[in-house]
Amino acid sequence: MAEKEISIIHPRPSSIVAALYTLRDLNVDVAIMHGPPGCSFKHARLLEEDGIHVVTTGLDENNFVFGGHDKLVQLINKSVELFNPKLIGIVGTCPSMIIGEEMHDAVLEANPDVPVIEVEVHAGYHDNTKGVLFALESALDAGIIDHKEFERQKYLLEKATEVEKKFGAASREYLAPSRGDVKYKAAQRVIQLLKEGKKGLVIMNAKKETGYMFADITLAVNEVAEALGNKENLINMANIDPELGLPRVRQHAEYITRDLKAHGVEVHEIIGGMDEYPIAGEKVSELIKEKYSDFDFAVISGVPHAIPMENIKNMELISITNGPRQVLPLKEMGHEYVLVEIDLHPKTLGVSGIVESEFGATLREVAKEA
């Protein structure tokens, strides 16, 4: 018998926003939102920090009744005039999709001399990964990605949804947000373990650009271990394969690899690409079973709940997420410390190098007192 779908009552990520971020990863120059002026304002503004122009047709009550075709045609032409883009994305919103706007007709009428990725999406999907899938389907139709990459991305989206429903913020009707454990206490514990000569895994399983801050945790643990003379007791794992993912995602992996090397941090095990966070945990589990089953502790950053507990359940686990609703599920899985990098996402947009994390900064300061 199929499991009954739970009715989640805490706010969930938007498919519209997911489509916007996917267009960013495809390196569009302009993203046009066909909807009201305030739709997805926060994320649209943040994406401008990441190097793309986000504009809106600004549909009003009159357009909700009579349509916004002409506005979209005009904005496509205006975007070409202002920004001289090489690739344009257009994203639907709830009103434009409800009234049945034909975005493709507007593209045909404007006839820009550049490829256009049209994403017919609204926010009424239970899984925000629908927005990603629709954007990728349109990118495939436009010849921006090939069928092999599309199928790879589709598989990753299915696994990401599965992970969230099993162990993440979609695993129950309501999860209260939490700031997690005190970072000072967790830092003290990591330092104590290092001082005692315990063997530790430092695992980064990060989602795309969030890796710019989660990589700092890897960096900080290694810096402290080196200062204590126990760096050889650490094994670093990270999902930073620069050959995998959409263009922007591969670039993130290159930059993080560069910065870790510059600081003398060796990544002993590459566990996947930066979009493979839903499946990299299986690779981690296999590696631990084969080579690292006798290790004492693990510092896991990014998406810790995607790493199966089977081969880490006997280790002391210190995990760092950027999801306030992820604290309780991780605690219930068996993670002793769960920390939240609450302002991570805004700080990792528009950057091209590792950004200091709260836990990394805390660990460095506490180590000075040790």
From Swiss-Prot:
It is an enzyme of class 6 (ligase). It comes from the Archaea. Keywords: ATP-binding, Iron, Iron-sulfur, Ligase, Metal-binding, Methanogenesis, Nucleotide-binding. GO terms for biological process: methanogenesis. It catalyses: Ni-sirohydrochlorin a,c-diamide + 3 AH2 + ATP + H2O = 15,17(3)-seco-F430-17(3)-acid + 3 A + ADP + phosphate. Its EC number is 6.3.3.7. Its cofactor is [4Fe-4S] cluster. It holds the Pfam family Oxidored_nitro. Gene3D superfamilies: Nitrogenase molybdenum iron protein domain. One of its GO terms (molecular function) is ATP binding. Homodimer or monomer. The Ni-sirohydrochlorin a,c-diamide reductive cyclase complex is composed of a NifH homolog component CfbC and a NifD homolog component CfbD. Belongs to the NifD/NifK/NifE/NifN family. Involved in the biosynthesis of the unique nickel-containing tetrapyrrole coenzyme F430, the prosthetic group of methyl-coenzyme M reductase (MCR), which plays a key role in methanogenesis and anaerobic methane oxidation. Catalyzes both the six-electron reduction of the tetrahydroporphyrin ring system and the gamma-lactamization of the c-acetamide side chain of Ni-sirohydrochlorin a,c-diamide to yield 15,17(3)-seco-F430-17(3)-acid (seco-F430), the last intermediate in the biosynthesis of the coenzyme F430. This is Ni-sirohydrochlorin a,c-diamide reductive cyclase complex, component CfbD. The lineage of its organism: Archaea, Methanobacteriati, Methanobacteriota, Stenosarchaea group, Methanomicrobia. The gene is cfbD.
